UniProtKB/Swiss-Prot annotation:
Full protein name: Na(+)/H(+) antiporter NhaA
Function of the protein: Na(+)/H(+) antiporter that extrudes sodium in exchange for external protons.
InterPro entries: Na/H_antiporter_dom_sf, NhaA
Signal peptide boundaries: none
Classification lineage: Bacteria, Pseudomonadati, Pseudomonadota, Alphaproteobacteria, Hyphomicrobiales
Reaction catalysed by this enzyme: Na(+)(in) + 2 H(+)(out) = Na(+)(out) + 2 H(+)(in)
UniProt gene name: nhaA
Amino acid sequence: MRVRFGQYPNCGKRMVLEPGRLRPYSILRSFLDSEASAGLTLMFVAALALLLANSPFAPVYFDVLHRQVLGLTVLHWINDALMAVFFLLVGLEIKREFLDGQLATWSRRALPGIAALGGMVVPAVIFIAVNGGEPANLRGWAIPSATDIAFALGVLSLLGPRVPVSLKIFLTALAILDDLGAVLIIALFYTAELTPLMLILAAATLLGLAALNRFGVKPLAPYLVLGVVLWFFVLQSGIHATLAGVALALAIPLQASTGGGPTSPLHRLEHALNPWVAFLIVPVFGFANAGVSFAGLGLSALLDPVPLGVALGLFFGKQVGVFGFAWLAIWLKIADMPRYASWAHLYGVAVLCGIGFTMSLFIGLLAYPESAVLQDETKIGVLLGSTLAGLIGWLILRVTKAGFPERT
């Protein structure tokens, strides 16, 4: 039996809208379905990248990634340009959920928000504790603080109706808040030397985007043109270029035009981008960044401070932080347990939050831009911690009895 959104009381009431409009839970269901299948795609390309990086084709793989195209390497185009589109989608999702979705009220934000906070703080503390004797390594403190929603929902999708829908919504909301935290971390802690002129031009472009929103411009084309201009100025300013995607997302109108199309510009852009990001951009990023050669590496390499701190932070830190903070919030009656979910369900999802992959790899690149060795060690830690979290989280949820009624 396939669980349907809106089937259970905790998922909220179905809303009847004008003909042709998207129902909120249709949007969420579509999002979850695509993210789940995208997670499986991401697993495949990550495994393929590892295989190529440790095969006779490794020189070709690395040569293509470091080939210069229009002044940047292919890897830089992927990490700076394609990932800006990924962050644009992240920004759109954050804005929609905060204004008109699962995070629209403080009561809905409480449990995923508190759990997300724990899931960022505890892994960072573990990483710092492991790497305290190596000051140069401490720039990577935020690496294990991220959750990869595509991977996590991909694992949940393998469990079918054994997992309550409310728990999938909880994980989605937590991951969105986690992404918001990652965006703030990148903006505050991983900014290079700034170029004042480019910052001024970027700010002027932002004002232009704000003016379009303020005057009710609904066509997407003007926003996208200014978004490309903003990306260029941000790229040259010293701030990481991907943040231009988030800034552009905040300017896209959420309200539909009166007498116009049935959906808002934000919804149109989100649904247009979703398949491209899920099945092209994120897999390309994973393929380009997951490949690490194990040649010359022994088991002792896993005990180096960076991979050990990342792996322990993702696997132990995430589950302790997410589950511990969620338990405290429920015990203090600040938040409620997701409907039809048990403590075992919640713990299993907390373990799955240790799948860091996309955002963890991305932060690792920002943390150690000049050290290929530390970047490779980061990849090893991310792959190890994420794999353990995925396998153990799946096993916990697989053996946990479904706590909600079967309905047809």
